[in-house]
């Protein structure tokens, strides 16, 4: 559910 850097995780 969150976007970190350029990676979508959960």
Swiss-Prot record:
Question: Any extra remark in the record?
Answer: On the 2D-gel the determined pI of this unknown protein is: 4.65, its MW is: 26.5 kDa.
Protein's name in the database? Unknown protein from 2D-PAGE from elementary body
Q: Please name the source species.
A: Chlamydia trachomatis serovar L2 (strain ATCC VR-902B / DSM 19102 / 434/Bu)
């Amino acid at each position: 559910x969150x976007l970190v850097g350029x990676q979508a995780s959960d």
